[in-house]
Amino acid sequence: MTDWKQYGPIYTIAPGIKKLGKLSIIEFDNEEERYLKLKKKSKENIYYDNLYDNKIDGKIVQKIKSILSQEYPNKNIAFQNFKEIGYSIQEDIAIFHRSNKLIGLHVSFPSLWIPKEKIGMSFSAIHQPVPGMEKIIENEKKYVDMMINAEQPIVRYVWGEHFSYLLSPLEPIDKGSKVIHTERQTFIGMPEDDLGIFLIKKKVMLFDDTDIEFQQWYKNQIISMSEDQKKYKIGI
């Protein structure tokens, strides 16, 4: 597991959005085969809003192909539509429209949320359950525009924990085993098409396998949470 040092010393719901810098937009690592196999076995992981049509599908395909051709010119990746894209890369994918609507989802590794419940929702409706999000929700137009207009991709990191499985429920483990998950969330704007692509790269690690440095950081995160945040984030 990587990325946890990106989150800062105390817990915050602030977006923490950064420029992508030298990172690749789409990431392939040594667990590519594991991710893709789990995706192909997943069920109830692909959803579309009525606003999503063939024209939008073609624009998304064109954009992802362009990114892959630049970042991985020698990698043989073939897909013809949004569904096939999701089975070709390790990231989960969400498509957001400038009208403030989530219109496409290909999500096999959700972190304690149910994809079919979010499709068609606005930015504020999606984030309503998260304690402390009030000010961000009040400024939802700002954040929607930021996603859609991010021609130079931007990135943020989030973390959480869950029990009973590793990357997905298709990898069950002992119910009492705590798993730490991190997500690298990358936003790719397509302003000329009023679209934003949202990539989610999830990584996991058993809490018992983390080192002392991480566990002290984790302890400080919990201490700094409000009671509502503890209940939402870790079920306390």
Give a label for each model feature.
Residues 1-236:
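Extended, well-ordered protein cores
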